[in-house]
């Protein structure tokens, strides 16, 4: 009996000392919970690391592009030339330049002239408002003969981008026509429907060809030259050449002009992100002059002998106002203008005329009448 009791006691103690068997369900639950909790902690960390990696990769890529662009421009000066001319930007789109009436110019004729072999330029000739009714249904010969009527002529040289059918340009033609002027404008070679490759020399030669074409038909009527933005560079090139051959226009009007293309490029909003880049001039400005593009208005005005009117809006975001003012100061002190009128007309920021809306000014007709004089036909009214 004692042995049996002792064996029972030993077995009882062994059983008590042995660990209790774990519940299978409980064990499974624990084994599942622990990895799940661990994964939940790792997932946000993984997301954050992945987001940071992508952001870092984007920053490195953008930095690489930022650094590569100056070298690309330096190695390919033609890129800068295209950015100066922007002749590939044809706005407004889908207009037929052969049909100026589609732009509300019912008193306008479309011509094509050939300044050089393999170069053809599209020209618009808008007659004065007094001739609108007579112009209906007339052909090119009638319009050419009309240049000999007693109305002054304005040769308009537009800026970069777009065509002769640009909205703000068309609105200016209408204003000038209503004031009694013929308006002749054209697209330089490489712009609009004009054939050829753009260059400063080519643009200037196109303008000279159109000027001579006008003078051959306008008799003794005054011919004025009006340049806007990049067109001011063409205008001063042209007028300097005309003065050198002693056939100057009656007056030169520069709207939103700059001093020279290097200073304009340095001040242009596109250059902001690179303006303080080491070697900015070497990377960005030298390739422009390497391409033969100077448009040196500040030099040209020293050789121009005719009346000069400069119009500039203070809030111009493309050609800064101070460049127009600087050009005026150079011209006003130049000996070449000592016998001619030089006038600068600013337009206050509050008016909101910016780079291309000076035509909206109700003061513009008065400014032109006082500077150019009243067109002869208006004396009869």
Curated annotation (Swiss-Prot):
It comes from the Eukaryota. Keywords: Endoplasmic reticulum, Glycoprotein, Hydrolase, Lipid metabolism, Membrane, Transmembrane, Transmembrane helix. The active site is at 229 (nucleophile), 316 (charge relay system), 355 (charge relay system). It is found in: Endoplasmic reticulum membrane. Glycans are attached at residue 106. Residues 80-381 are extracellular. One of its GO terms (cellular component) is endoplasmic reticulum membrane. Coiled coil: none annotated. The keyword Endoplasmic reticulum applies. One of its GO terms (biological process) is acylglycerol catabolic process. The chain crosses the membrane at residues 59-79. Residues 1-58 are cytoplasmic. Its EC number is 3.1.-.-, 3.1.1.23. It holds the Pfam family Abhydrolase_1. The keyword Cytoplasm does not apply. One of its GO terms (molecular function) is monoacylglycerol lipase activity. It is a single-pass membrane protein. It catalyses: 1-(9Z-octadecenoyl)-sn-glycero-3-phospho-L-serine + H2O = sn-glycero-3-phospho-L-serine + (9Z)-octadecenoate + H(+); 1-(9Z-octadecenoyl)-sn-glycero-3-phospho-(1'-sn-glycerol) + H2O = sn-glycero-3-phospho-(1'-sn-glycerol) + (9Z)-octadecenoate + H(+); 1-(9Z-octadecenoyl)-sn-glycero-3-phospho-(1D-myo-inositol) + H2O = sn-glycero-3-phospho-1D-myo-inositol + (9Z)-octadecenoate + H(+); 1-(9Z-octadecenoyl)-sn-glycero-3-phosphoethanolamine + H2O = sn-glycero-3-phosphoethanolamine + (9Z)-octadecenoate + H(+). PANTHER family: ALPHA/BETA HYDROLASE DOMAIN-CONTAINING PROTEIN, LYSOPHOSPHATIDYLSERINE LIPASE ABHD12. Belongs to the serine esterase family. Lysophosphatidylserine (LPS) lipase that mediates the hydrolysis of lysophosphatidylserine, a class of signaling lipids that regulates immunological and neurological processes. Represents a major lysophosphatidylserine lipase in the brain, thereby playing a key role in the central nervous system. Also able to hydrolyze oxidized phosphatidylserine; oxidized phosphatidylserine is produced in response to severe inflammatory stress and constitutes a proapoptotic 'eat me' signal. This is Lysophosphatidylserine lipase ABHD12. It comes from Gallus gallus.
């Amino acid at each position: 009996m004692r042995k049996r009791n002792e064996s029972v006691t030993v077995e009882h103690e062994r059983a008590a000392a042995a660990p209790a068997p774990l519940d299978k369900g409980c064990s499974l639950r624990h084994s599942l919970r622990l990895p799940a909790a661990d994964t939940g902690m790792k997932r946000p960390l993984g997301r954050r690391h992945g987001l940071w990696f992508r952001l870092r990769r984007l920053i490195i890529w953008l930095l690489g592009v930022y650094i590569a662009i100056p070298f690309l421009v330096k190695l390919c000066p033609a890129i800068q030339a295209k950015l100066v001319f922007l002749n590939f930007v044809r706005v407004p789109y889908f207009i037929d330049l052969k049909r100026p009436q589609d732009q509300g110019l019912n008193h306008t004729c479309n011509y094509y002239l050939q300044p050089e072999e393999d170069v053809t330029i599209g020209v618009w000739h808008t007659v004065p408002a007094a001739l609108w009714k007579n112009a209906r249904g007339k052909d090119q010969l009638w319009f050419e003969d009309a240049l000999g009527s007693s109305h002054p002529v304005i040769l308009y040289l537009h800026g970069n981008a777009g065509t002769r059918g640009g909205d703000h340009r068309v609105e200016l033609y209408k204003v000038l026509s209503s004031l009694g002027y013929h308006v002749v404008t054209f697209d330089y070679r490489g712009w609009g429907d004009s054939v050829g490759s753009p260059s400063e020399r080519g643009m200037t030669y196109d303008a000279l060809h159109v000027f001579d074409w006008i003078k051959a038909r306008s008799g003794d009527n005054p011919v004025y030259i009006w340049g806007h933005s990049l067109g001011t560079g063409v205008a001063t090139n042209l007028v300097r050449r005309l003065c050198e051959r002693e056939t100057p226009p009656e007056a030169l009007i520069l709207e939103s002009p700059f001093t020279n293309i290097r200073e304009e490029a340095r001040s242009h909003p596109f250059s902001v992100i690179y303006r303080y880049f080491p070697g900015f001039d070497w990377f960005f400005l030298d390739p422009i002059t390497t391409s033969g593009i100077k448009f040196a208005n500040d030099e040209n005005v020293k050789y121009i002998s005719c009346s000069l009117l400069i119009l500039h809006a203070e809030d111009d975001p493309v050609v800064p106002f101070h460049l127009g003012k600087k050009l005026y100061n150079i011209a006003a002190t130049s000996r070449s203008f000592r016998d001619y009128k030089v006038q600068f007309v600013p337009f206050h920021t509050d008016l909101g005329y910016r780079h291309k809306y000076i035509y909206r000014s109700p003061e513009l007709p008065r400014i032109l009448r006082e500077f150019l004089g009243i067109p002869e036909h208006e004396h009869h009214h």
